[in-house]
Amino acid sequence: MNDAALAPDVSAALERGLQAQSLDTAFAAPLLRYLALLVRWNKTYNLTAVRDPRAMVTRHLLDSLAMQPYIASGMLADLGTGPGLPGIPLAITRPQLQVTLVESNGKKARFMREALRHLELRNARVAESRAEALDEPTAYDHLTARALDTLAGIIAVGGHLLRPGGSLLAMKGIYPHEEIAALPEGWTMSEVHQLQVPGLDGERHLVVVRKA
C-alpha cells in the first residue's frame, strides 16, 4: 500500500488536523507515507491495536503532534516508541530535532528502520533496546513517552539518559495529580499543558518534568 491507496477522507482529515495544529500541510505527504506503511505492516505484524487508517490519523499522528509546540531543538529520545509514536511524526515535522527511537520489540524496530529508509528521514535513528539498558547517560535534552508508564516509572527506566536541566515530556489522559505528587527526588514538575487533539474526545495533558 502506498499513500495513494489510502482513502481520500484520510488525507483530508490529516490536512484539516495539521491546519488546526498550525502545521504546514506540506507535512501531510511524508506523514501519509508513514501511515500507509504502518497500515500495511500492521496487517501482518500487529504493531498497533488501532487498525482503521482514519482512526490512526487522530489517535496516532495528530495525538503525537499535539506535543510538538512544547519541544525545543536538540537531542530527543522517545522511550517505548512502539512503531515510532510520537518520535517519527515529530522527526518529520521538526527537522532540527535529532530523534532516537527506543524500542526493544524486534518487529517494531524492524518496521521503524524500514520507515526511516522509506521516508529518507535523516534526523532519526532506531535503538533496539530497553530504555534502562541504553548506555547513553546524559546524552539527551528531551525524553518523550506517550503510553509507557507512570512518571516515576518512566524516570526509573530512562532518567539516566537525560542531561541535567533536561525535560521529560509525558503524554497523559486526565491530569495526573497522584503521579506528579510521587515524582522522585531531583525531579520537578515544570509545566502541564492541556492539549487539544483534532477529532479526539477526552482529556489529554502533556506533563513536562525537569531533571535537576
Curated annotation (Swiss-Prot):
Cite the GO molecular-function annotations of the record: rRNA (guanine-N7-)-methyltransferase activity
The protein's name: Ribosomal RNA small subunit methyltransferase G
GO CC, alphabetical? cytosol
Quote the HAMAP family the UniProt record gives.
16SrRNA_methyltr_G
List, alphabetically, the InterPro entries matched. rRNA_ssu_MeTfrase_G, SAM-dependent_MTases_sf
What superkingdom heads the lineage? Bacteria
Name the species this protein comes from: Xanthomonas oryzae pv. oryzae (strain KACC10331 / KXO85)
User: Which residues make up the binding site for S-adenosyl-L-methionine?
Assistant: G80, L85, A131, E132, R146
Q: Which UniProt keywords apply?
A: Cytoplasm, Methyltransferase, rRNA processing, S-adenosyl-L-methionine, Transferase
NCBIfam families tied to this protein: rsmG_gidB
Question: Of which family is this protein a member?
Answer: Belongs to the methyltransferase superfamily. RNA methyltransferase RsmG family.
Catalysed reaction equations from the record? guanosine(527) in 16S rRNA + S-adenosyl-L-methionine = N(7)-methylguanosine(527) in 16S rRNA + S-adenosyl-L-homocysteine
Q: What class of enzyme is it?
A: transferase
As recorded in Swiss-Prot or TrEMBL, the protein's gene is named rsmG
